[in-house]
């Protein structure tokens, strides 16, 4: 009998004590816990938590326009768009899309936190999904006291020729003004094949959190064609 199947695996290599490279081939996510079913009665997409180890490790590096707790000041959820949402890679409506190969570089290089990721997914006839390449680049630096600034860029390309390409890029910052007052801001833009205009998003936000009181003020603008797809 002929052997039918594919060989896959993961390799982790510490380039320096603070910088790690990960390589993956024919990634197997078969053992990942299944998402709980939820009923969505709104026009907005549901965002399920990431459960795959490959994307969980070093995930804080890839946060954009968010503090360490996921929001500027730890308040409730904001309508801030996700410039990078890892579950868009290798999943389609909860169904697994095979990842042929990929690599990731995360850690610290001098004063900078860096994150690089490139993954190639396979086509899936059953879900009409085309083979797609995903790239994410993140650079962040701590400044002043418990503050940070950074830039990020993502690219999703259905073909090497660029057909079906979506690019997103932006800059963000979070600033601790006092022990109780935090400010955050970002600007981002997307470029999608066949779509023009009204493709920017930006935000300014203040969070005040004291022992007994808290408040927040926010200005958020999201263009009708702003559409990060990674």
Predicted features and spans:
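Transmembrane beta-strands of outer-membrane beta-barrel pores
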Residues: 27-31, 109-111, 118-124, 153-159, ...
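Residues that cap or anchor secondary-structure elements
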Residues: 1, 29-107, 118
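Aromatic-lined, polymer-binding surfaces characteristic
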Residues: 112-172
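Residues that define the transmembrane beta-barrel architecture of outer-membrane proteins
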Residues: 3-7, 97-101, 108, 130-135, ...
């Amino acid at each position: 009998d002929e052997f039918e199947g594919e060989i896959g695996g993961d390799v982790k290599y510490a380039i320096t004590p603070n910088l790690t490279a990960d390589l993956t081939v024919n990634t197997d996510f078969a053992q990942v816990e299944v998402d709980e079913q939820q009923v969505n009665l709104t026009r907005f997409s549901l965002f399920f938590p990431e459960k795959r180890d490959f994307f969980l490790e070093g995930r804080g590096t890839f946060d954009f326009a968010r503090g360490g707790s996921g929001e500027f000041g730890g308040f409730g959820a904001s309508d801030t768009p996700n410039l990078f949402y890892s579950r868009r890679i290798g999943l389609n409506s909860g169904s697994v899309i095979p990842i042929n190969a990929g690599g990731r570089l995360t850690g610290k290089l001098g004063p900078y936190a860096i994150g690089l990721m490139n993954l190639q997914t396979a086509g899936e006839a059953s879900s009409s999904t085309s083979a797609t390449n995903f790239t994410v680049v993140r650079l962040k630096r701590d400044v002043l006291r418990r503050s940070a600034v950074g830039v990020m860029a993502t690219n999703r390309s259905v073909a090497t020729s660029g057909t079906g390409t979506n690019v997103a890029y932006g800059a963000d910052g979070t600033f601790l003004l006092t022990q109780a007052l935090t400010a955050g801001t970002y600007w981002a833009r997307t470029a999608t094949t066949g779509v023009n205009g009204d493709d920017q998003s930006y935000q300014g936000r203040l969070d005040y959190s004291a022992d007994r009181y808290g408040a927040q003020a926010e200005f958020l603008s999201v263009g009708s064609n702003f559409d990060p797809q990674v």
